[in-house]
């Protein structure tokens, strides 16, 4: 995704036009810069994408990466001034940043899940972006925008 400095950012998706506010563009640039520094494929996912398609304002964004989400959150936090606290949940491989204006940013590593026949609790292990998307239900959670393309 080519991120440019402007009052808003427009991304063209086949048959769709998605517009980002100046604040959203700034956040996306910082996450994209951190992902590039770490060399991890990263996608904006879920409700944020839905809200942008519908032309709604947002107050949070979720990202999935093909790698260490906690490391990506830590690298992203360094892009802000002041540097926000990174809350992480090592058991789940997730992290959270709240920037100074109250905007929440969540990070999760791509994963795949498998189930034993007698259990509803998944066995979780790191996976590819494709495996992560395949495990999601076919609703809002499966929407994604690449930060690299």
Q: Where are the predicted features?
A:
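Catalytic cores of the polymerase beta-like nucleotidyltransferase superfamily
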Residues: 5, 11-149
């Amino acid at each position: 995704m080519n991120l440019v400095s402007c009052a808003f950012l427009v991304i063209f998706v086949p048959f769709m036009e998605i517009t980002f506010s100046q604040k959203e563009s700034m956040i996306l640039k910082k996450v994209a810069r951190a992902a590039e520094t770490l060399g991890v494929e990263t996608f904006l996912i879920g409700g944020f994408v839905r809200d942008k398609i519908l032309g709604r304002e947002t107050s949070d964004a979720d990202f999935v990466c093909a790698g260490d989400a906690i490391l990506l959150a830590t690298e992203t936090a360094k892009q802000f001034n002041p540097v926000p606290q990174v809350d992480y949940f090592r058991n789940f491989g997730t992290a959270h940043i709240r920037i100074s204006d109250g905007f929440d940013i969540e990070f999760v590593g791509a994963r795949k899940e498998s189930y034993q026949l007698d259990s509803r609790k998944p066995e979780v292990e790191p996976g590819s972006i494709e495996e992560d998307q395949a495990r999601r239900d076919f609703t809002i959670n499966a929407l994604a925008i690449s930060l690299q393309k």
